[in-house]
């Protein structure tokens, strides 16, 4: 791709406002790994221009040094992603083409299999990026972790899309929270938690769902109720509260949190 000359006077370059420059720098910092190489190549000159535009604006430049995004859970180092495979996957998604790949399954054996995939979307969850797709031999929507791709090639054939697929609806269904029972689809449950008043305060600030209710049972205990997907992620999250949870309903969620065989 092309770049602005490093010695070009700032006056000769296209004008970029302070807010535009900050936005480009934030995009480069936080979203660059989610963009296909062809778009990055086109945007690199604008990233350069943003840096140069802010070089003379100390107060705005300091904004970049004063804003950070930190994970809500234990931070981990992102797994290594095979660069060529990542580039092909991104280009396949961008061009709406099928991808032929070799993918390593999870587990210590790490069995490698070949697939032809129809890319539908990308989702970053924590340190891991997932490709949402369907396989040529199966119609159900699946997730493939990017770091487990050994290789990938963009095919000339057009990707096939499920008729009713919507990435936001897919995420809202709890699919990326991962199923508690892989033999069954994710289901919504009416979760009820009983906690002491101080602990329940958390849910008045950050709701589990739009239909969440927080009710006082007595002077000390509160009940939080909400309809949420029953996923492994929900189970892990509830475990993090430890003894703060006086009661959990329904019983299948209680059993999963406490690892009780049902």
What feature does the model see in each segment?
Residues 1, 98, 128, 218-225:
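A generic structural signal for beta-strand entry/edge sites
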Residues 1-7:
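Minor-groove-contacting beta-hairpin "wing" of winged helix-turn-helix DNA-binding domains
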Residues 8-16, 221-227:
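A ubiquitous short alpha-helical element
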Residues 12-104:
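Bulky hydrophobic/aromatic content
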Residues 16, 138-141, 249:
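Short alpha-helix boundary/capping segments
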Residues 27-28, 46-50, 149, 238-242, ...:
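Short amphipathic C-terminal alpha-helix that caps PH/PH-like domains
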Residues 68-192:
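Core beta-strand-centered patch of the WYL/Sm-like small regulatory domain
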Residues 172-262:
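Polybasic (Lys/Arg-rich)
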């Amino acid at each position: 791709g092309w770049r602005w000359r490093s010695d070009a006077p700032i006056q000769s370059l296209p004008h970029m406002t302070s807010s535009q420059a900050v936005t480009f720098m934030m995009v480069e910092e936080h979203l660059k790994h989610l963009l296909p190489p062809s778009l990055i190549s086109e945007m690199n000159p604008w990233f350069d221009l943003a840096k140069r535009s802010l070089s003379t604006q100390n107060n705005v430049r300091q904004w970049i040094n004063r804003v950070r995004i930190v994970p809500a859970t234990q931070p981990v180092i992102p797994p290594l992603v095979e660069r060529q495979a990542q580039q092909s996957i991104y280009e396949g998604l961008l061009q709406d083409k099928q991808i032929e790949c070799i993918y390593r399954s999870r587990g210590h054996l790490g069995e490698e299999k070949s697939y032809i995939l129809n890319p539908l979307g990308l989702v970053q969850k924590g340190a891991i990026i997932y490709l949402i797709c369907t396989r040529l031999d199966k119609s159900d929507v699946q997730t493939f972790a990017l770091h487990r791709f050994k290789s990938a090639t963009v095919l000339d054939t057009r990707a096939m899309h499920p008729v009713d697929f919507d990435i936001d609806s897919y995420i809202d269904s709890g699919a990326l929270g991962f199923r508690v029972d892989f033999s069954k689809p994710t289901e919504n449950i009416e979760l009820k938690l009983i906690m002491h008043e101080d602990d329940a305060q958390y849910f008045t600030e950050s709701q589990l769902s739009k239909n969440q209710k927080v009710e006082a049972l007595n002077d000390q205990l509160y009940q939080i109720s909400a309809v949420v997907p029953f996923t492994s992620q929900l189970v892990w999250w509830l475990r993090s509260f430890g003894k703060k949870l006086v009661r959990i309903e329904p019983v299948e969620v209680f059993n999963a949190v406490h690892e009780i065989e049902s």
